[in-house]
Amino acid sequence: MEKEIVFCKGGGCTAKLGPEALKHVLDKIPKAKDPNLLVGFEGSDDAAVYRISDDVAIVQTLDFFPPMVEDPYIFGQIAAANALSDVYAMGGDVKTALNIVCFPEKMDLNILGKILTGGNEKVMEAGGILAGGHSIADVDVKYGLSVTGTIHPDRIFKNSGVRPKDKLILTKPLGVGIIATADRVGEASEEAMDKAIKSMTTLNKYASEIIRKYDIHACTDVTGFGLLGHLHEMLQNEYTAVIQSKSVPYIKEAYDYANEFLITAAGQRNRNFVESFIEYETDDFAMQEILFDPQTSGGLLFSVNPEDANKILEDLHGLEMPCGIIGEIMELQEKEIIIR
């Protein structure tokens, strides 16, 4: 792998503000009142949705962050795939994207060219058009996209809406944050990084298109708040989810690195925010860290009727990405999340 970006500190979605700090600020922002704003920021959804006609709504999102890999082209691909993912988590289709660039004035512009090339290729793969962007000089590289998509107003996937007996399905393996952390200190194997990069550069477009054929009750993508943080947002303290940890897909090496305490500060922020809602029926430390691990360009997490779960899983297996039925929803218990 070509190594040209050598300052990967807290890159990817590990760079996000912690959920507790973010909630503290957003709770003080007045909520917009417009009947055509179908999804705003009040529900922790992945993107905003605004209705422009009876049949069409626009989906808007943006995401950018510092590098988590040292190859600029791959970084561009990952950052773009991550930004595009929010449209797919809502059930929409990508139409246009704008580059968001922070770049040091004294750095080789060829590096920026490689980042933008990687990003553009993912936008094209998504079926979208790169239509422009904005750049500023900064001490560190940061890159991402502002993305616009479309969706039918009656077919939006929200992150709320789970129902008792629903099955929870995850479409990508966990552990990329832990592996990137291990790589920054020279402890990750090439095989582990290859697995992480394959996951992070895979668009959620394909999984989203599959699950739209079914009755999806709630959906989100797993990113900086980790699986348990995003699951907490889905449950809204109204239901309980039972997670079968042995059914959760993850990259094997991430488990080994977690046992060696190669874990992220962002993962610990996620643990601190969510842990009071959790009951552990297993003392597997490494698995706990994987469940809290911030993901960059992570998979879709969705709830669905139990009778559809196995058929959806069969369809998803055709994408050749580890996925699984990881748990189920039940009426609210003493704790919101139970880990078995």
From Swiss-Prot:
Lineage of the organism: Bacteria, Bacillati, Bacillota, Clostridia, Lachnospirales
Cofactor note text: Binds 1 Mg(2+) ion per monomer.
Marked site positions, Important for catalytic activity: K16
Known role: Synthesizes selenophosphate from selenide and ATP.
Encoding gene, per UniProt annotation: selD
Complex and partners: Homodimer.
Gene Ontology molecular functions: ATP binding; magnesium ion binding; selenide, water dikinase activity
GO CC field: cytoplasm
Pfam family, one: AIRS_C
InterPro entries membership: PurM-like_C_dom, PurM-like_C_sf, PurM-like_N, PurM-like_N_sf, SelD_I, SPS/SelD
Active site as annotated: C13
EC number, UniProt record: 2.7.9.3
Positions annotated to bind Mg(2+): D46, D86, D221
Protein name (record): Selenide, water dikinase
Cofactor requirements of the protein: Mg(2+)
Domain of life: Bacteria
